[in-house]
Amino acid sequence: MAGTFPPKISPTLMTPDPHFIPGYSGFCPQYRYSLGKTYGQLTSQLLTNPDIRRSELLVLQSNPFPPPRDHSFDGGSQELGGRRQHPGDPNLTISMIPGYTGFIPRSQKFFAKTYAETSRDALSDFHSERRGQEAQRQELLLMSKLQEGRLPRTEQEKQLLASRHRTPLPALAKEPAPFMALRGFQPQGSPYYMEEENPNKCFISGYTGYVPRSRFLIGSGYPITTNRAMVEFAHMNQKKGVRFSEGYKEGGSPHTEPGQIYLEELGLLPRYTGYVPGYKFQFGNTFGRLTQNALGHSTLQKQTVN
């Protein structure tokens, strides 16, 4: 019974090397002209056939064991910026495997190389920069201690440039003096009630409120567009004989009348989500036409108006 089954490592159960595994999307010579076998057996036959011209350097090489991982960088195994060493396998090593989706510092500066070379050069550059920053920090710390007299000076340190002032400098006052602007901000009111020649008659970029007639103007910046829209809106209201209250200039409400929602001369703006008497029974006209003088006309009068 034991002689019926082949051994575990045999050409019957395992495809002999060299061969390509299924899913390999690279080029294999004469593969498109061969058929009748599995992908592994067919590529193994093509790669070992002496009659087929192919490159002497194989793309895939057999390597039963992964290469030893080297966790050392140029300049020794110093920690980055004084970071505490932690147990376990570090993520950033000198032999990075392609397909790693984590962040590699300085990798954007290197190109035209393989992933492993780019990762190695980027991490070496990053370590060198951090070591330089650590050296500068130690130098500043040493100079601070020397200026404060906490360390005895050597002959070389006595030749360093010395400051005339001791650090930290003493404070002249406990609290800073209050700052008062010479020309404080003065609110100028709503742009709707400004004169047409006023340069502030516009809305700044980023304003998300509704500006009448602005959707029909294109090709200019937002302040210029809103200025032209409000001027055009004012001219349209003048032709209709609608005048807005000037009480807002004196600190009053910006509306025509406080608490008034349904106007007699104008309809409501589109997308108004409030209640309009009799609107649900009307059709055949725009929202503004149907909501004009909502409290004065009956449903039959609104359907026959205009």
Swiss-Prot record:
CC per GO annotation: axonemal microtubule
Keyword match Ribonucleoprotein: no
Highest taxon of the lineage: Eukaryota
Compartments reported by the entry: Cytoplasm, Cytoskeleton, Cilium axoneme
InterPro entries per UniProt: CMI2A-C-like_dom
Tissue: Expressed in airway epithelial cells.
Region (Disordered): 61-92
Keyword terms of this UniProt record: Cell projection, Cytoplasm, Cytoskeleton
Coiled coil: none
Record has Cytoplasm as a keyword: yes
Stored Pfam families: CMI2B-like (PF10629)
Function: Microtubule inner protein (MIP) part of the dynein-decorated doublet microtubules (DMTs) in cilia axoneme, which is required for motile cilia beating.
Family indicated by similarity: Belongs to the CIMIP2 family.
Name listed for the protein in its UniProt record: Ciliary microtubule inner protein 2B
